[in-house]
């Protein structure tokens, strides 16, 4: 057997305080875009015991009831009493929203006068997109499994299968891989870790049994589990206090969970609460589409794409491609194909990926369980573009 290594990714589910904040910020974005597709939104959220605050810069024609959005989002997640960490109907809601800075507005969109191809990047920064052929989603298996475990925890809480569950929870998966000439091949699941909030009545034995039967079994393919797989199920022994009561929450604190679970790279910019002129979001979405399209079209088994911007400038400063040695043609040729097939100007990304369209909880859906690898028509950046290329003669 080839030499193997261990790699780990984590996830948190929708009741985690940081993820609660991401979801509120994106619910606000959805509400603004639904009424006014040209809304400029930079919405942050923070939370602690019995309090949620939304703050930031929003310029919109939309009539938005921020307090209602906060309470509805908290309620939908399951924060319906102080016992579970927050009471959606009784908590304090603070709102401190101002207009977008006129300095930024004139530089980016000329106070709404610029044509789409002339819209400048909303800020400087660099973003990465990643794809790998180890799963059908073209995402890392560690990240896919950690995310699906978190999603499944929420499912069995809401459908009553495990009535003792509460909204907050974290998951983590370690996988043994081998490196096949630059491509990642999963061998087995080494460790599964779940820490979930629970009510006072349930025993640790029942927690472990239910998690194995109702969460792990339906999510992790049997072929990856063996007698050596390690399970850490609520290893701290008690997790009754959770949500904002247990920990403060803040938008943009879970950027690796939102992306590739530690694989690839990250430029540092968060997604939630940002309209598409913010290249932290739109730039990261288009380079995911580029990386995914490279792998799906057979140009490489694994690949990373970087793009960078200057505030107020439409054209990217740089585009970079690395296929980790898995490319069927040289990386410089893959880069050329990427530049010919993808328009990295923010205004054009917005049009090509239809990013001004709110409603249908479109961006709210991205704010829990990952922005990438999702099978949902609203995730337009997951659509593979056909790329024309010629296989080199053998």
Curated annotation (Swiss-Prot):
Cellular location(s): Cytoplasm
Main subcellular location: cytoplasm
InterPro entries given in the database record: ADOMET_SYNTHASE_CS (IPR022631), S-AdoMet_synt_C (IPR022630), S-AdoMet_synt_central (IPR022629), S-AdoMet_synt_N (IPR022628), S-AdoMet_synthetase (IPR002133), S-AdoMet_synthetase_sfam (IPR022636)
GO MF annotations, alphabetized: ATP binding; metal ion binding; methionine adenosyltransferase activity
Binding site for L-methionine: 57, 100, 247, 278
Residues reported to bind ATP: 16, 168-170, 236-239, 247, 253-254, 270, 274, 278
Textual note on the cofactor: Binds 2 divalent ions per subunit. The metal ions interact primarily with the substrate. Can utilize magnesium, manganese or cobalt (in vitro). Binds 1 potassium ion per subunit. The potassium ion interacts primarily with the substrate.
Pathway given in the UniProt record: Amino-acid biosynthesis; S-adenosyl-L-methionine biosynthesis; S-adenosyl-L-methionine from L-methionine: step 1/1
A cellular component term, taken from the record's GO annotations: cytoplasm
Cofactor: Mn(2+); Mg(2+); Co(2+); K(+)
Superkingdom of the source species: Eukaryota
UniProt KW keywords: ATP-binding, Cobalt, Cytoplasm, Magnesium, Metal-binding, Nucleotide-binding, One-carbon metabolism, Potassium, Transferase
Any one GO BP annotation for this protein: one-carbon metabolic process
Positions contributing to K(+) binding: 44
Family per similarity comment: Belongs to the AdoMet synthase family.
Function: Catalyzes the formation of S-adenosylmethionine from methionine and ATP. The reaction comprises two steps that are both catalyzed by the same enzyme: formation of S-adenosylmethionine (AdoMet) and triphosphate, and subsequent hydrolysis of the triphosphate.
Subunit and interaction comment: Homotetramer.
Protein name as catalogued: S-adenosylmethionine synthase
Gene for this chain: METK
